[in-house]
Amino acid sequence: MEDNKLILALGLSVLFVLLSKLVSSAMKPRLNLPPGPWTLPLIGSLHHLVMKSPQIHRSLRALSEKHGPIMQLWMGEVPAVIVSSPAVAEEVLKHQDLRFADRHLTATIEEVSFGGRDVTFAPYSERWRHLRKICMQELLTAARVRSFQGVREREVARLVRELAADAGAGGDAGVNLNERISKLANDIVMVSSVGGRCSHRDEFLDALEVAKKQITWLSVADLFPSSKLARMVAVAPRKGLASRKRMELVIRRIIQERKDQLMDDSAAGAGEAAAGKDCFLDVLLRLQKEGGTPVPVTDEIIVVLLFDMFTGASETSPTVLIWILAELMRCPRVMAKAQAEVRQAAVGKTRITENDIVGLSYLKMVIKEALRLHSPAPLLNPRKCRETTQVMGYDIPKGTSVFVNMWAICRDPNYWEDPEEFKPERFENNCVDFKGNNFEFLPFGSGRRICPGINLGLANLELALASLLYHFDWKLPNGMLPKDLDMQETPGIVAAKLTTLNMCPVTQIAPSSAEDAS
């Protein structure tokens, strides 16, 4: 009898909970959500993504072509809106920028980004605004970027000499440009950030590579963030955290070594002059010493800012440069025109400087066209809705993640003629730029969360590209034809070229010797 009463009580309790949920749901106003594909229990819309393409930006474009430029998806229990037109992007990133100023964090990215406390992934807040202000007014000003001109020129000259030696050695196997260009980018960012080459660089890059692999795919914790069990069983967040701890340890060593060096210089009476390349770390240590910033520049702050510098600057430029070289090999006409412009600008010189490339309009068009076709982040870093709002007549509830498919927008035939073709001339006499105001072309984002390192990334990219075109002609290895180049992309946050780019340099203008370049 007692058992029957217990069962009855339990049944009534369950019924009460269900009725309460039904009543609560009925009392809520029905939302006019954006259209989207049909969903399945638990996984939501995921089956539509995995069935179409390993590159999620391609799958999303295919779905948007059917459901419209603003589309609702469910990533497990996480609501997401996909934006695939300039008009909707402008509404989200400009007119309602503040409402969408937060970041969407997966469980793995949260672990890798210090709990979402770095500049890239931190939520919109006073702290984030002050950290970004330090970046924009102290680390990434035009004057600061120009101050590293000598660093860029020396590192690029070193690469050119290595390639000239490879060309002299002959052979048809080609040079692995992915390795060479990645090393160049990492050396530039290390010297600019901490004042010299870093003995811990390879350790840091190895940990970064592991972290990048973990954030490529969604884990069960990303699909069900409210579930503690999902968080416990998910492997990627744990691996991401382990990688981040390795990277943090390297950065803390670098900071301490620099502090020790500055103390030794001060004790020896060398002072600021010897300390002195005024790298990013030196600037941050000076701000730490002086105090007075709204957010104290603690060692923890220095760690996350250097982390953003290392990871951001060493990723974008080499990815884009590899795509440019691949496209130029597939389009000999554009290659010849770009080479002619560079060689005319620096005729008779054995070394390109940044002063030589200021007026190279066609080179800049080539870079723009590569950014259009191969935006490093095909989906802009996702925003998160801070308050319920409406976009294009549709309700967007608070907490919704918003993904702008810039890859699809940059291939929209309504805005781009022959959108799949590599045609730098489309930017001739065209005011469209990537600074955040032309919403059909936003490779670096727009609004409050636009990439703060645009000028630094472009400076690294332009000089390297100009130098490779100035000194060398290029051919593909082992008799490969341009049409045989694999132009597939890697899946994940960054759409790099899937296969390694191997090319054979043929020296046309011999570089200066190491002694002349120093």
UniProtKB/Swiss-Prot annotation:
Annotated S-S bridges: none
Transmembrane segments annotated in the record for this chain: 6-26
Top-level lineage group: Eukaryota
GO terms for cellular component: membrane
E.C. code: 1.14.14.69
Intracellular or extracellular location(s): Membrane
UniProt entry keywords in alphabetical sequence: Heme, Iron, Membrane, Metal-binding, Monooxygenase, NADP, Oxidoreductase, Transmembrane, Transmembrane helix
Primary site of residence: membrane
Needed cofactors: heme
First-tier enzyme category under EC: oxidoreductase
Alphabetized GO MF terms: heme binding; iron ion binding; monooxygenase activity; oxidoreductase activity; oxidoreductase activity, acting on paired donors, with incorporation or reduction of molecular oxygen
GO BP: diterpenoid biosynthetic process
Keyword Iron (UniProt): yes
Topology of the protein relative to the lipid bilayer: Single-pass membrane protein
UniProt xrefs under PROSITE patterns: CYTOCHROME_P450
Xref: InterPro entries: Cyt_P450, Cyt_P450_CS, Cyt_P450_E_grp-I, Cyt_P450_sf
Entry's family note: Belongs to the cytochrome P450 family.
Protein name, as recorded: Ent-cassadiene hydroxylase
Organism: Oryza sativa subsp. japonica (Rice)
Gene name tied to this protein: CYP71Z7
